[in-house]
Regions:
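Interaction/scaffold regions that mediate signaling and macromolecular assembly across diverse proteins
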Residues: 2-255
Length: 255
C-alpha cells in the first residue's frame, strides 16, 4: 500500500484486503481462526493504529461517514477474533462500550461511533441518552451529513450481521443504498396475503430513525422490486403489520 495515501485511504484498503482474503463472497462469514494469526491482520492493525494521529475533520464533507464506518467495521473484525466458534459476539467483554479505537488522540467505543457520531448522539436501544455527554470534545467529530442507511453498513460479525464492507471514494449514497437493498433482498419477507411484512430487528430497536412504523414500511417497500408483492400490500389499504426478526449474535465463523 502506498505511503502517499492518507490514513483513511489506508484503512479502507486494509479492510478491503481482509474482506477479500478472509471472508466468503457475501462478506458475512469470516475465517476468524486465520485472522488470529498476526501476519493476516498486520496491515489492518497498522492502519487502525495510524488513526491515533489522524483528524478526520480534514476529509471532504462526504467522506467522514465512510471513514467512521470503516473504523467501526475494522474494530469489530479485530475484536471478533476473541470470540470462539458457536459463541455470541455480544459476549465479548465491553465490545460496544469500552474504548477500542483512538482517533485524533481521543478514545472511542463502538457505541460512541455508532450512536454518538453516526446517529447524532441519539440513545442506543434501551437507553435514555446518547453515549457522549454534553460538551464532550468527541462530538466535534460528528459528520456534518446524516444518513439513516448507515444502520445497514455496520458490521457485527454475527449470523444476523450485515455484510462486511469497506466504503470508498465512490458516491457514498450508492454504496449505502447497495447495502440496504442487499439486506431487504435477504431478510424481508411478505405474507402471501400481504397481511404482514417481516423486517430486520434493527427497525424495532430504532423506529424513530425511520419515521416510526409507517416510515419503516415505506422505507422497505421502496426497495422491493416485485410488483405482485407490492400489489398484495396495496390491497390491504394500510392494514399491514410489521413482524421483527430475531437477532442471532452467534459468531459467523467460516467452516
Amino acid at each position: 500500500m502506498s505511503q502517499t495515501k492518507n490514513p483513511a485511504e489506508r484503512l479502507h484498503d486494509a479492510l478491503q484486503r481482509v474482506r477479500e482474503l478472509h471472508f466468503d463472497a457475501s462478506g458475512r462469514v469470516g475465517d476468524y481462526v486465520a485472522l488470529r494469526r498476526v501476519e493476516n491482520v498486520r496491515h489492518l492493525e497498522a492502519a487502525v493504529a495510524a488513526l491515533a494521529d489522524f483528524d478526520p475533520r480534514s476529509l471532504p464533507i462526504s467522506e467522514p461517514i465512510a471513514f467512521w464506518l470503516n473504523a467501526y467495521n475494522a474494530t469489530v473484525v479485530l475484536a471478533a477474533r476473541a470470540c470462539a466458534r458457536g459463541e455470541p459476539v455480544s459476549g465479548i467483554p465491553g465490545l460496544f462500550d469500552r474504548p477500542r479505537l483512538t482517533v485524533a488522540g481521543h478514545g472511542f467505543a463502538l457505541d460512541d461511533i455508532e450512536h454518538g457520531l453516526l446517529r447524532g448522539n441519539a440513545p442506543k436501544y434501551g437507553r435514555w441518552s446518547g453515549p457522549l455527554p454534553r460538551g464532550d470534545p468527541r462530538l466535534d467529530y460528528t459528520p456534518r451529513l446524516y444518513d439513516e442507511r448507515v444502520h445497514f453498513a455496520l458490521f457485527s460479525a454475527c449470523r444476523s450481521s450485515h455484510a462486511l464492507r469497506a466504503f470508498g471514494p465512490d458516491p457514498l449514497g450508492d454504496q449505502l443504498e447497495a447495502a440496504v437493498r442487499d439486506c431487504v433482498r435477504r431478510e424481508v419477507r411478505v405474507a402471501e396475503d400481504g397481511a404482514w411484512v417481516e423486517v430486520p430487528r434493527l427497525f424495532k430497536w430504532y423506529p424513530g430513525d425511520f419515521g416510526g412504523e409507517p416510515g419503516i414500511l415505506d422505507f422497505v417497500l421502496a426497495r422491493i422490486d416485485d410488483d405482485a408483492v407490492l400489489d398484495r400490500i396495496d390491497a390491504r389499504q394500510g392494514n399491514v403489520k410489521l413482524h421483527y426478526k430475531a437477532f442471532d449474535w452467534t459468531l459467523d465463523q467460516r467452516e
